[in-house]
Amino acid sequence: MALLVDRVRGHWRIAAGLLFNLLVSICIVFLNKWIYVYHGFPNMSLTLVHFVVTWLGLYICQKLDIFAPKSLPPSRLLLLALSFCGFVVFTNLSLQNNTIGTYQLAKAMTTPVIIAIQTFCYQKTFSTRIQLTLIPITLGVILNSYYDVKFNFLGMVFAALGVLVTSLYQVWVGAKQHELQVNSMQLLYYQAPMSSAMLLVAVPFFEPVFGEGGIFGPWSVSALLMVLLSGVIAFMVNLSIYWIIGNTSPVTYNMFGHFKFCITLFGGYVLFKDPLSINQALGILCTLFGILAYTHFKLSEQEGSRSKLAQRP
């Protein structure tokens, strides 16, 4: 009986963790979009706030023994910290200049780009069926972008740069974790302050600092509270991702990501009244089919690899 109670509690904890991640992941997209649309807060400055709050949050976490920091040489993290800046800044610029549907769908292109990088730069091979799933993903993104009545060329440039830098960042994070033998929180603990320092230097060259529209400009209390809330939620997203992967698996997190993908798209059309044509809807379904097929084939191949290892004498 006690064992059954423990199992039920465990399932409830995981369900609560997944629900929390769902809420904060969707909330951060809509909140950032709201800040851009209704307050006009500068992009790089918002990213800087996110990085600083994330580092402060991680500092509190390590003081509470949630994780143990590991000493890392800063010189080996410079490129990673720079790509971290790039991926968050360009992703936020994509959100600022595109509809939520186009922003969310463009992010799906990260999978094909990661596969291309690993194939050409790291000589990693992928099965034919995995490669074929890239066709519906890419076709769906093209369909949605082509028929988007709010199509924005600058927004698509930012989306493309965001996908490229995000893909590089994700590949490098995996490589650095393996190379330095650290987990994601230990890596982020060093990365966040380095990225904050880089943005602190860059912000004055691209955005006003003290004048109208600057980070220290005459903002309303509501705008400042929303920016601070955005930073706290961004940290919660990172923390909940780490908790979910640690208590379930990366596969569970990715499968749950498909549900968040659909909810975020739907919320964008409801909250911000983004128009949706039939062809765009077909593009979304096409991309979603490709993502689900990719996940299914990837799972099958991982299970096959485990079975072969288990059968070895």
Swiss-Prot record:
Molecular functions (GO terms): antiporter activity; nucleotide-sugar transmembrane transporter activity
InterPro entries: Sugar_P_trans_dom, TPT_transporter
Record keywords, A-Z: Membrane, Transmembrane, Transmembrane helix
Its membrane topology: Multi-pass membrane protein
Biological processes, Gene Ontology terms: transmembrane transport
Subcellular location: Membrane
GO cellular component terms, A-Z: Golgi apparatus; membrane
Top-level division of the source organism's lineage: Eukaryota
Major subcellular location class: membrane
Transmembrane segment boundaries: 17-37, 40-60, 77-97, 126-143, 153-173, 187-206, 225-245, 252-272, 275-295
Family of the protein in this entry: Belongs to the TPT transporter family. SLC35E subfamily.
PANTHER family assigned: SOLUTE CARRIER FAMILY 35 (PTHR11132)
General function of this protein: Putative transporter.
Protein name: Solute carrier family 35 member E3
Taxonomic source organism: Homo sapiens (Human)
Phylogenetic classification of the source organism: Eukaryota, Metazoa, Chordata, Craniata, Vertebrata
